[in-house]
Amino acid sequence: MPSLRQKVTTYFRQLSFIAEPREGRRRASEHEDDDGSFITKYLEGRMQRQFVEGPEIYNGQNPTDMPVLKLDTYEAGNCSITAACTGPDEGLTGIKRSKLHLSTSFADDIDFIDTQQENDDCYGVRRSTPPVQVATQNSTRLTSKFGRPPAGPRRQSSAEQPSGSASASGMRSRKNSKSSIANLAAASAGTDAGKANSDQNNRNVLNAKTEVSTDGDPNSERERLLREAVSNQGGSDPAALIAGVENWRMECDFAYGISVSLYETNMLTKEPMGNPIADCYGMVVRGDSAAMAMADGVNWGDGARLAARSAVHGCLDYLDRAVFGQALECRATTTQEVFVSLLRSLWEGHGCILEVGGALSTLTIAVVLPLDGAPGKYVVCSCNVGDSLGYVYSKKHGVRELTQASHDISSMRDMRDALGALGPADGNKPELSNLTFSMTCIESGDIVFLTSDGISDNFDPVVGKFAEAWTPDVKLQTSGHVKPANLAPKRQNKSASAIYARLHPSTPPTRPARQSKAESPPNNAPSRPKYMRSQTLIEPRQGLVSAPPPSVVPQRIPKSISGLPLVTGPQRHALTLYRLEDLLSYGINGTFSPCVSARRLCHLLIDFVRMITSARRKTLEQRELFYKLSTGPDGAKREVQLNRMQHRAARKRVVDSSAFVALPGKLDHATVMAYTVGGGEEHNNGNENGDGGAISPVLQSKEFKETNF
């Protein structure tokens, strides 16, 4: 039985509801109905983010364009590795490269990937825009040192490479044989006198600053020591080690990666279409620092997978020797040194692709290092080519795209264009039209994650069919409840009585004048008492009674004929980040707590893209695309298996249909790799609590409810 307090409270609520005007209640219900989607709130300008603005993201096209920050000491060497992972399958370990064993005496004759060569015409880079002319000679010299690509495959088999190819092209090739080293030493000894000055100019300053140092600077001595240290490390490690790692299955909660195929499963072979997965990722964590690399092979096939694995293999192996080497000369002290090493590792990945004969691949590299004089503060430096993107998630600042400058957010780009790629894009030259360096400051607990376009594109509101791109050829939805163009002519809108009165006019009847009634005699009896309004009435809110001012009325968003809101390029990019924020902060069904581990983040992203593309997969897994009904000689109908060409034709017919185009999502290879900053320090505490080593299960799409995205 309800208590007295409950009865009084219910009575007050009833009084408040009765006293509220009907117009106010109707407006309140309409406001609640329009408040369901954050996309609508963002487009109407009513969205209130609970995140504060994060640190600035710096970007540039050259290592000298980036600000210089001093780094704190960090752990290096093979013994300091706390986590390492690669994939899918064997990942970068599927590439077997024979390393060149060199001694210190041949350090100056190493064909470093960033050394300026005499024949600059052989090392041009294909770019969509002409290179910027640098005014000063020093800047030109520094740029040429940073951006020199290799002219061709660094190693070829003896059957494919002619003996005189190296001398004919004017390039020193790196071969894994003692005779090659002897020939290289003899050739260099014969030309030492003529190349003394050019060799001095060709030395790269790894400890680069904004101004190029003059001859005689101690940096030249540091450069010589660095070259010797990097070359000696190549022959000191066992052949089984790749990037200094012996066991690549050391993933954990703070360092994790997943790669899956979103394509449909072939009903006959029981394998996903598009195999093998042409993505590759690799990550090495040393204490509070990490090196990450993500590659996405262009198109399908073994060539694309080989290119992705080679790119990750080459860049991580170089970073292991140049940034995380055993020697002190191989450890970076400023962020500019890190960017120089990132660019060199990118070219090393390109050279590895040419060595193994791979196709094209995108590449995104990120290095997380601690900042000097700021405990708990870190910096992430990245270099990317193509459409594999990098992000930073923080419970304080939300989601920020680290590689935002690599693509134009103000335009509606074609999702099928990778924008750039390593490998033989133009002869033996890569496509570096969107080569971008990025940097931002992060804190302990933030999560840095790299994704392929199979992840990032499926968070796009246009790809997810939550909105439509506002292009010049799109048709807008007309506003208003009544369409004047569909109304009948005025004469046809007349009623039958109105038409009859118009055709048969008559004099309307006149109404007699009213007479005033006599006044009633005064009544001296006491009148009935009038009840006053209850003083316990709870007055309704002012905003529900009175109409809102014109400035508060949300702006009407333009919509297409299909009813979807139209978004511009910047709005499209912002909504992509907001969807990532919403997923990582509240989960798929909006009831989870913010994501705190790299493992959980990877599973959330993979589960989301699986869900949003499930309709397309189910459509392409229909039995009619693999079998057809055929009538036999006895007149009985039976199923006949389609051959490969017939299946391709049937699949293409379904994919090109308007019904399939209207389905949300994009079928692709989806890969994500994440690292929790400073996670290695808290790893032991997590294991003591009993949840540090728990493996999150791969959740299926059917276990989730629909989200209010």
Curated annotation (Swiss-Prot):
Q: Which residues form the PPM-type phosphatase domain?
A: 259-503
- InterPro entries recorded: PP2C-like_domain (IPR053287), PPM-type-like_dom_sf (IPR036457), PPM-type_phosphatase-like_dom (IPR001932)
Which superkingdom is the protein from?
Eukaryota
Bias kind Polar residues: ranges: 130-143, 197-217
| One family name in Pfam for this protein | PP2C_2
Per the record, where are the segments of Low complexity compositional bias? 182-196
SUPFAM superfamilies, per database record: PP2C-like
Region labeled Disordered — which residues? 121-222, 503-530, 678-709
Q: Which PANTHER family match?
A: PP2C-LIKE DOMAIN-CONTAINING PROTEIN CG9801, TIPA
Q: What is this protein called?
A: PP2C-like domain-containing protein CG9801
